[in-house]
């Protein structure tokens, strides 16, 4: 915050004239200072996402990914990828490499089968949250565990706060009742809530009833929030959002949230620079 003092000299020997001019000057500076600290937002309606249908995979990209490139949608702070994936029965992503990325998977429905070069082999489903810290490099595969139904999940990539870490894997099963009319933390930097991520980043998920209101406090200056409505309707930071709409918000200490319909909300806090 900048503090300014304006001194206005008036040749007229009228005290009230000088007071009025000084007051007007201070009001102008106050207005300028407030304008500099205005909350910033970017709105990403659901229809503006990249889309690809590969038959076995129907995917929507919030940020540039694979063959979809939008120079204005490269990332939001340290948030690099937010893919909304649906994989048909028995299909999936074959074994492939990653490095220096924090990769979070959040199943929405169905069962997702995971295997990796660290020796992990598991199936995750709604209520589970998985993270791979790729670090110096890992190999992994993800496939639909079931033959007769789709698996739907969010694939989220966050840039780490340090390169070439030793690869790690984390998984947790959350109590869905803890998401009822509140924001449940499912990812945090120290792992005290949810799984641990190597970044100043917190993920929250909420299952909200119409009329629910709250305010989310960011974890310090330089942080931003990216909120996506998974189902229903929610107003975040004054921006009305429908299903799969998203808004990015930064340059603020708090964000007001109101469910205008029964809804499911994902909120991702990340540093805007890292």
PLM feature segments, named:
Residues 172-264, 271-274:
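Acidic/His-leaning functional-site neighborhoods
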Residues 4-5, 10:
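Cysteine-centered motifs
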Residues 99-118, 126-129, 216-237, 243:
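Glycine- and acidic-residue-biased ligand/ion/polar-headgroup-sensing regions
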Residues 119-121, 134-164, 251-274:
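Ligand-binding loop in jelly-roll beta-barrel domains
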């Amino acid at each position: 915050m900048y503090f300014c003092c304006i001194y206005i000299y008036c040749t007229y020997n009228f005290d009230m004239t000088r007071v009025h001019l000084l007051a007007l000057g201070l009001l102008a500076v106050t207005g300028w200072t407030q304008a500099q600290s205005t909350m910033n937002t970017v709105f990403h309606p659901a229809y503006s996402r990249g889309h690809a249908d590969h038959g076995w995979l129907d995917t929507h990209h919030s940020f540039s990914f694979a063959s979809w490139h939008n120079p204005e949608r490269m990332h939001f702070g340290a948030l690099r990828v937010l893919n909304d994936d649906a994989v048909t029965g028995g299909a999936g992503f074959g074994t492939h490499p990653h490095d220096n990325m924090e990769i979070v998977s959040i199943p929405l429905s169905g069962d997702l089968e995971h295997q990796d070069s660290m020796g992990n082999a598991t199936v995750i489903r709604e209520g589970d949250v998985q993270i791979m810290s790729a670090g110096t490099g890992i190999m992994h595969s993800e496939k639909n565990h079931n033959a007769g139904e789709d698996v739907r999940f969010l694939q989220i990539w966050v840039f780490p706060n340090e390169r070439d870490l030793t690869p790690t894997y984390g998984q947790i099963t959350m109590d869905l009742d803890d998401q009822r009319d509140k924001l449940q933390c499912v990812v945090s930097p120290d792992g005290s809530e949810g799984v641990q991520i190597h970044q100043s980043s917190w993920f929250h998920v909420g299952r909200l009833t119409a009329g629910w209101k709250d305010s989310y406090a960011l974890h310090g200056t330089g942080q931003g929030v990216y909120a996506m409505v998974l189902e229903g309707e929610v107003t975040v930071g004054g921006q009305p959002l429908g299903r799969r709409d998203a808004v990015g918000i930064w340059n603020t200490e708090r964000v007001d949230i109101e469910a205008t319909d029964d809804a499911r909300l994902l909120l991702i806090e990340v540093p805007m620079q890292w």
